[in-house]
Amino acid sequence: MGAGGCISVSETKPNQKNSLERAPYDKPPFTISDLKKAIPPHLFKRSLIRSLSYVASDLTVAFLLYHATTYFHHLPQPFTALAWLAYWVAQGCVLTGVWVIGHECGHHGLSEYRGVDDTVGYILHSSLLVPYFSWKYSHRRHHSNTGSLDRDEVFVPKPRSKISWYSKYFNNPVGRIGVLFITLTLGWPLYLTFNVSGRPYDRFACHYSPNSPIYNNRERFQIYLSDIGIVITSLVLLRAAMVKGLVWLICVYGVPLMITNGFLVLVTYLQHTHPSLPHYDNSEWEWLKGALVTVDRDFGVLNTVFHHATDGHIVHHLFPTIPHYNAMEATKAVKPLMGEYYQYDATPFYVAMWREAKECLFVDRDEGEKGGVFWYKNKM
């Protein structure tokens, strides 16, 4: 039985429990209904005006950052290069916030009007080359099966028996750097296109294919709509490249998008990968236990930029329609009831990224155990 980590390891005090201690895996003494009752009812309310104000704010900042690039050529070197570097990082972070709001639309968390949510989400995600409905449906299955080794959709850890023979050659600092680089730069498009790191299917799975086994017959038409959104955005980008040049497009749009993709992969990875978290096979998995297989993280000022997708993720898994601007208050409301089932780690995200890449290579039962509870391990 582990404790909810209230602080990072480096900040642990004698009277507080270590965030690397294992989370509890027994059936929680509370129900989802108990948790819902602990949250003030007004926090479930979704205001269209307030939600759109965040959309407008993010898009305004993104435009101002873009507008600033039109003055970079007036700067002497090396300040031009530094200005572009600052732009890439800042714009990548802002667009991650835009991506998060699009994700919230997919959960019907923007407003009380599902059609409005899907329209806004479709526009925002398509502009970032994300197939909106395609990912919405696969992500919904992730929420329905979190923590399940058999049915979860993404970042499903492999049991020891299924790790590749060559994995041991990457279990070193150089190998980890290579794996992290590929994961952060190519992980998102590889997942969408080839289902890399996703749940295994009996045939080819792809977010762009209406015939993918990820989707049922009722969903296939909207996969076509998602693809149309990607095609329209691609044509706009092609036209921009023809008018402004390919280098301009890469600098203004391509590099920030890569940073956005890297952040969304990193955030998702750290939300569900932690030495303290269990995973379950079918004999042990229950929805509430699985929903608790996640950890809130501290990304510093980026918590706000990313609309609390980082430090409000547990309550998001429990109640995904709660709007992001109420997530922290809702988290505060459920923490006393959750007790040690609430997992939080304030380790800086770049430190946690390296630690998890080193410690969380596969999952296995504890020695001598035969149950359905699996823990992260790294000894091959």
From Swiss-Prot:
Pfam family, one: FA_desaturase
Catalysed conversion reaction: a (9Z)-octadecenoyl-containing glycerolipid + 2 Fe(II)-[cytochrome b5] + O2 + 2 H(+) = a (9Z,12E)-octadecadienoyl-containing glycerolipid + 2 Fe(III)-[cytochrome b5] + 2 H2O; a (9Z)-hexadecenoyl-containing glycerolipid + 2 Fe(II)-[cytochrome b5] + O2 + 2 H(+) = a (9Z,12E)-hexadecadienoyl-containing glycerolipid + 2 Fe(III)-[cytochrome b5] + 2 H2O
Keyword Oxidoreductase in record: yes
Location of the motif Histidine box-2: 139-143
Entry GO MF terms: oxidoreductase activity
An annotated GO cellular component: membrane
Motif (Histidine box-1): 103-107
Keywords: Fatty acid biosynthesis, Fatty acid metabolism, Lipid biosynthesis, Lipid metabolism, Membrane, Oxidoreductase, Transmembrane, Transmembrane helix
Membrane-protein topology: Multi-pass membrane protein
Sequence motif Histidine box-3, location on chain: 313-317
Enzyme class: oxidoreductase
Compositional bias ranges of the Polar residues kind: 9-18
Domain of life (superkingdom): Eukaryota
Residues passing through the membrane, by range: 52-72, 81-101, 177-197, 223-243, 247-267
Keyword Isomerase: no
Protein EC: 1.14.19.34
GO terms of biological process kind: fatty acid biosynthetic process
Compartment(s) where it occurs, according to its Swiss-Prot or TrEMBL record: Membrane
Chain segments carrying region Disordered: 1-25
PANTHER family: OMEGA-6 FATTY ACID DESATURASE, CHLOROPLASTIC
Assigned protein family: Belongs to the fatty acid desaturase type 1 family.
Role this protein plays: Involved in the biosynthesis of dimorphecolic acid (9-OH-18:2(10E,12E)). Converts oleic acid (18:1(9Z)) into 18:2(9Z,12E) and probably palmitoleic acid (16:1(9Z)) into 16:2(9Z,12E). Very limited ability to catalyze (Z)-delta(12) desaturation.
Protein name: Acyl-lipid (9+3)-(E)-desaturase
